[in-house]
């Protein structure tokens, strides 16, 4: 009986390993772009091809949004994924045991995206649910250097095998995926515990006063790449003007400090806001973590649709933050440009949503 059970288990294991091999081969054959296997990981995180652990450059990242597979191959992939989830996933999960639980991120992810996954890993560990970690990805080094405790919930590639439990779920619903208590626990224990970041906060708190306004403007590929612009590009000037009007119902800022990846654009397009308060377009500090510290230190904050800014606002909840304003949309859902969320998943419910003055979408310009 024991020998039979072992034999059956061995056969099942071999079948699933063959399925794993053919799954990876299928991914390679159905992608039309030479780089696309790096991005198109399984939506449930059931496998990760070797190239998914490699660094990608900016042009490759843009390809995620611009490369389109032929309709036939997309249909074949849809059918394959449906069969996989219905009949094979549960058997694969049966073989995956052990205390380690790996969270996967897409190679196009950056710091703001990773923080949601690190927060989930920290929460699972805090509650004793799983020994969870985020799988290492290129570029994480600067984050684990700035916030050393994040290294303790980051798994090296050597820990990721076929038999490792894993999840490809991206926990971005800040009100449902993590409680306020757990969010604040993660920020205190893993971010504010950093001596280097605490020093940055101290410096930036000397830059602001009790009525300072910080405006975080995301530019970059949101506006330089048409396909990405269609998904994320908001009418920044009109939005910032409308947000400032709404803020002035409560307070007139003593000064306005801009944080952006394109401060020159801000100076050229938003300098007229100096009629409300003195504007500072010079970079405060030397790198992105100084920017994050400044956003977190803001008593009053106007955000655009960027996860980096969202995390600055989350951190600010534990500091001297008073009011946060954000656009009423994060992105357009590609499958349905009219899909509209009453609250973008990454936005906190106490943030003030800024609506278009003409009742339009900030991104598409269409009436809602």
Region spans (language model):
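Short amphipathic alpha-helix
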Residues: 116-124
């Amino acid at each position: 009986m024991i020998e039979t059970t072992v034999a059956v288990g061995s056969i099942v294991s071999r079948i699933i390993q063959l399925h794993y091999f053919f799954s990876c081969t299928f991914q390679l054959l159905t992608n039309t772009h030479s780089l696309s296997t790096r991005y198109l990981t399984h939506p449930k995180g059931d496998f990760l091809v070797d190239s998914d652990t490699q660094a990608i450059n900016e042009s490759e990242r843009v390809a995620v949004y611009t490369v389109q597979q032929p309709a036939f191959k997309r249909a074949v992939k849809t059918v394959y994924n449906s069969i996989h989830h219905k009949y094979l996933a549960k058997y694969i999960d049966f073989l995956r045991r052990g205390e380690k639980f790996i969270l996967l991120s897409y190679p196009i992810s950056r710091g703001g995206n990773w923080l949601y996954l690190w927060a989930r890993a920290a929460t699972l560990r805090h509650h004793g649910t799983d020994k969870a970690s985020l799988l290492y990805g290129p570029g994480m080094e600067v984050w684990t250097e700035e916030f050393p405790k994040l290294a303790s919930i980051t798994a090296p590639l050597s820990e990721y095998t076929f038999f490792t439990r894993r999840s490809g779920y991206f926990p971005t619903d800040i009100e449902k995926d993590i409680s306020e208590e757990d969010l604040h626990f993660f920020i205190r224990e893993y971010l504010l515990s950093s001596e280097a970041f605490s020093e940055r906060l101290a410096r930036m708190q000397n830059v602001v006063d009790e009525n300072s306004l910080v405006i975080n403007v995301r530019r970059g590929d949101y506006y330089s790449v048409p396909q990405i612009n269609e998904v994320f590009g908001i009418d920044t000037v009109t939005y910032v003007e409308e947000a400032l009007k709404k803020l002035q119902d409560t307070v007139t800022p003593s000064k306005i400090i801009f944080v952006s990846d394109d401060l020159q654009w801000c100076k050229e397009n938003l300098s007229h806001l100096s009629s409300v308060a003195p504007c500072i377009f010079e970079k405060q500090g030397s790198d992105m973590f100084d920017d994050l510290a400044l956003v977190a230190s803001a008593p009053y904050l106007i955000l655009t649709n960027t996860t980096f800014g969202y995390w600055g606002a989350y951190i600010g909840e534990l500091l001297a933050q008073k009011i946060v304003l954000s656009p009423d949309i994060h992105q357009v859902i590609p499958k349905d440009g009219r899909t509209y969320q009453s609250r973008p998943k990454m936005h906190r419910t106490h943030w003030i949503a800024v609506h278009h003055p003409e009742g339009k979408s900030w991104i598409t310009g269409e009436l809602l």
